[in-house]
């Protein structure tokens, strides 16, 4: 299981990186806007800054929704750094663009995936990653983790090399459910990654150890 952090915040990326468990970063236009990063050139400089922190894959999303625009933007993004993975929405022109990028050796992350059918098309087109959105499906009373498990089974049955990147993860519980479902990658907020470390018995045990140590060393 790989851990990606889902943010454009450099401080959070550094903190996750310093834990020693970070394998990559995913971003999107909403996350860029949240950090107040405006304009194409500023966003691309920001991607380069992220790549300078993390040695793993960094997903950078195209803004265009037409085939020609996605191909143009994707090539420009891929040229920024070898770690860039071009993030493409799962729409008809997006699938076409993924197929084009696959033939050119440009790695892709097919995003906004909500069904096994979409995941199948992404894999057939040669996507490096496919991103089923767990939390957003849960929001409408559908089974997000179940979709992850279904995609994993499908890919293994047909031997597709596309990696399942569980996205829209809201909690540490989501992470562990996606681990059990067989996801290759979980991309999540820093709070969810740090939440995996927390357990009341760990805190209580450490407190007891320190108290006992002080008693015999006073």
Swiss-Prot record:
EC number: 2.2.1.2
UniProt subcellular location: Cytoplasm
Active site: 87 (schiff-base intermediate with substrate)
InterPro entries in the cross-refs: Aldolase_TIM (IPR013785), TAL/FSA (IPR001585), Transaldolase_3B (IPR022999), Transaldolase_3B/F6P_aldolase (IPR004731), Transaldolase_AS (IPR018225), TSA/FSA_arc/bac (IPR033919)
Pathway: Carbohydrate degradation; pentose phosphate pathway; D-glyceraldehyde 3-phosphate and beta-D-fructose 6-phosphate from D-ribose 5-phosphate and D-xylulose 5-phosphate (non-oxidative stage): step 2/3
Keyword Cell membrane: no
One GO CC annotation: cytoplasm
Domain of life assignment: Bacteria
Matches recorded under PROSITE patterns: TRANSALDOLASE_1
Catalytic activity annotation: D-sedoheptulose 7-phosphate + D-glyceraldehyde 3-phosphate = D-erythrose 4-phosphate + beta-D-fructose 6-phosphate
GO MF annotations, alphabetized: aldehyde-lyase activity; transaldolase activity
One GO-annotated biological process of the protein: pentose-phosphate shunt
Keywords of this entry: Cytoplasm, Pentose shunt, Schiff base, Transferase
Family: Belongs to the transaldolase family. Type 3B subfamily.
Function: Transaldolase is important for the balance of metabolites in the pentose-phosphate pathway.
Protein's UniProt name: Probable transaldolase
Gene: tal
């Amino acid at each position: 299981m790989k851990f990606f952090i889902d943010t454009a915040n450099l401080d959070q990326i550094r903190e996750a990186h310093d834990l020693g468990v970070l394998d990559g970063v995913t971003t999107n236009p909403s996350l860029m806007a949240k950090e107040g990063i405006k304009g194409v050139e500023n966003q691309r400089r920001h991607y380069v800054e992220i790549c300078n922190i993390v040695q793993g894959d960094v997903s950078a999303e195209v803004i265009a929704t037409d085939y020609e625009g996605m191909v143009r933007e994707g090539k420009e993004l891929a040229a920024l750094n070898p770690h860039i993975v071009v993030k493409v929405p799962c729409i008809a022109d997006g699938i076409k663009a993924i197929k084009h990028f696959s033939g050119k050796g440009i790695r892709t992350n097919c995003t906004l995936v909500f069904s096994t059918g979409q995941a199948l098309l992404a894999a057939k087109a040669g996507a490096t990653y496919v991103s089923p959105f767990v939390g957003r499906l849960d929001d409408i009373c559908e089974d997000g983790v179940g979709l992850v498990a279904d995609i994993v089974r499908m890919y293994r049955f047909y031997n597709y090399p596309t990696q399942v990147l569980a996205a829209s993860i809201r909690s540490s519980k989501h992470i562990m459910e996606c681990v059990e479902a067989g996801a290759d990658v979980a991309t999540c907020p820093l709070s969810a990654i740090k939440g995996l470390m927390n357990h009341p018995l760990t805190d209580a045990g450490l407190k007891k150890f320190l108290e006992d140590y002080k008693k015999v060393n006073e």
